[in-house]
Amino acid sequence: MKPRLYAIAVAICVVLWAPFGHAQTTPVKALVLYDAPTTGSFQKLSFAYAIMLRNLLGHWNADVDLQPVEQYASGQVEQYDATFYLGGIYDNQVPLTFMGDVFNTQKTVVWFKYNLWQFAWNPNFDFAGRYGFTYSALRGMNAAPTAENPAPGFFDTVDYKGKALVKYYDFQNGTINADPDIGVTTIADPAKATQLVTIRNPKTNEQAPYIVRSGNFWYFADVPFSYIGPRDRYLVICDILHDILNVQHRKQHRAMVRFEDVSALVLPSTMRRLSDFLFNRDIPFSIAVIPFYRDPLGEFNGGTPMEVHLAEATRLKRALKYATARGGKIVMHGYTHQYDAKRNPHSGVSGDDFEFWDIVDNTPVLEDSVEWAGARLDAGLLELKQNGYTPFAWETPHYQSSPNSIRAAVSRFKTTYQRVVYYTDDTPDLSASNPARDFAVGQFFPYVIEKDYYGQRVLPENLGNIEYDISDIDPTSNFNYTWQDLRLNANMGKVVRDGFASFFFHPFWLDPEIGTPGMADFRRLVNAIDALGYRWVDASRVGAPQPAN
């Protein structure tokens, strides 16, 4: 199998107020409002952000409603414990009724990025008098990038809990893969407003508030759901939601590890080495199993098509027998982890290609339906069951499938263990030529999501995986992602008070013909996560978030 790294990127305070309790005895009621303009090519972008926020709220026992801000009705904020407004579209008109209700309510309100000027500069509201801070301006790039100065800089570094979380960007080819815009605010009355988090502009040495709180009102200088990463300011919203909702979870940092793409071609010797290492360290682990191996084009079999059902997969069953006896738990990782007899997009081989998404055309596969996907899931479950295996969770191949496929999985698995791609429609049209196009957004989680937008329970994988440049063997595998990179991700992830360090590892990195230091680097990474103070846990036994003592 060819190793692949699929990086899922997003295309994309002190006045009297009434908290709603420290211990969560009833669901939090939350309203997420988003911009929904009827013109332009970003009509659904804020909806995508709203889905991502809704997912994070699924870490709590929460009832969440999503609604265009244009449809806001008078008095709605009083029906919810917390209302969030995602200002994702510049100067999208915010209803005056909403601003009036925000000004008068004692309920929690969180405003992100754009359009605060419509509220703060409106003479009908004494914004500065009420909240103790002012809105100054919108800031973006320090200058337009040029060949001579391709990285002019912007406010890109968020300081939080002693760590510098930097927005991801890449100036190659003149493309900046980050959102440089922030809303700049100024504290006018420290008795009313507090700058909770700071954002810095390293090129100009300027600082600005990233999060301001004035009693029940919170303001974020940007929308923290664009271009997210494991070292990004996205971790701030993941953590500080505990304070916004005023529902605290037990502070603990746990770690999980999963062996990936374990199929009929796995070498039992590599699984023995990996299993023994973890077993001797008393570290639980999971195994992502592909039940039915297919190479319909003969890509790795000299041009001859090859299929191996689990019942015939002698090497795989030997490996699983050894690993499960040492604590390994089974995750079902697709049925075949490839699609049809075609390249989708690489080889058509199990573990290499997408199964439930046409990645070549970036659309659902032709057969896509809940029934079609369900039949594949049932076939995979049957192969596992007939051979004595019961998976505790589902993992989508390459973390991307259609909404129909996701719903098929929800009805069959209580738990998933993965990252997820979300869509702004159940039958998404992602073509750039469509002015009202949909958006697909990839999201990882630093903690357990009890219920996401599609109804899934999601165990986190948030660090990524070790990758090596083996382009001399496979020209398309030319990417290095080191154990040190994952260690850095784990270190940054500690800002989340109940965050995980969860990663996966491909056993084939131990294959002699590949010639990488896979085993040594795996050991180093496990030791590094230990040294950071994480506690290894069995993914199959991870329960709901626990309230703080």
Regions found by a protein language model. Give the residues of each.
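C-terminal domain-boundary segment and adjacent tail
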Residues: 66, 241-251, 269, 273-295, ...
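A glycine-rich, often tryptophan-bearing local segment used as a flexible ligand/cofactor-contacting loop or short
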Residues: 85, 89-169
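Catalytic grooves of carbohydrate-active enzymes
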Residues: 254-264, 268, 371, 378-393, ...
